C-alpha cells in the first residue's frame, strides 16, 4: 500500500513539474511574442515618422511649384504637371484621412461636372448673342462707312 502512495505522489509531482515547465515555456513564448510586437510597433512608429516627413516635404515642394506657376501664364505641359501634382496631393491626403479624401474626390468631380455644364450653357447662350452683336456692329459700320 505504501508503494501505491509513493507511485501516486511521484506521479503528482511529475505532472506538477511538467505543468510548471509547460507554463514556463508558454510564458517565455508569450514574452517573445510581446517583445516582437513591441519591436514591430517601434519599427512602424519610425516608418510612420519617416513617411510623414516625406509627405510634408512633398507637400512643401508641391506648394512651392504651385506658387511659382501661379503668378504667370502656364504652358499646356506645365498645366499637366500641376494637375499631376494636385493628384499626388490628393493621394497623400487620402493616406491620412481616407474617408474625407473620397468625399473630396466626389465633391470635386461634381464641381467639375457642374462647371462643364455651365460652360456648355454659356456657349449656347453666348454664341447667338455674340453673333447678334457682331452683325449689329457690322451693320453700323457699313452705315457709317
UniProtKB/Swiss-Prot annotation:
Q: Give an example GO cellular component term for this record.
A: extracellular region
Q: Which InterPro entries match?
A: Bombinin (IPR007962)
Signal peptide span: 1-18
Isoleucine amide modification sites are 144
Q: Does the keyword Transcription regulation apply?
A: no
Q: Which GO terms describe its biological process?
A: defense response to bacterium; defense response to fungus; killing of cells of another organism
Domain of life, source organism: Eukaryota
Q: Tell me the keywords, alphabetical order.
A: Amidation, Amphibian defense peptide, Antibiotic, Antimicrobial, Cleavage on pair of basic residues, Cytolysis, Fungicide, Hemolysis, Secreted, Signal
Removed propeptide positions: 19-43, 75-122
Give its localization.
Secreted
Q: What is its main location?
A: secreted
Q: Could you tell me in which tissues this protein is expressed? A: Expressed by the skin glands.
Family, according to the entry, reads as follows: Belongs to the bombinin family.
Cited function? Maximin-3 shows antibacterial activity against both Gram-positive and Gram-negative bacteria. It also shows antimicrobial activity against the fungus C.albicans, but not against A.flavus nor P.uticale. It has little hemolytic activity. It possess a significant cytotoxicity against tumor cell lines. It possess a significant anti-HIV activity. It shows high spermicidal activity. Maximin-H11 shows antimicrobial activity against bacteria and against the fungus C.albicans. Shows strong hemolytic activity.
What name appears for this protein in its UniProt entry?
Answer: Maximins 3/H11 type 3
Organism, scientific name: Bombina maxima
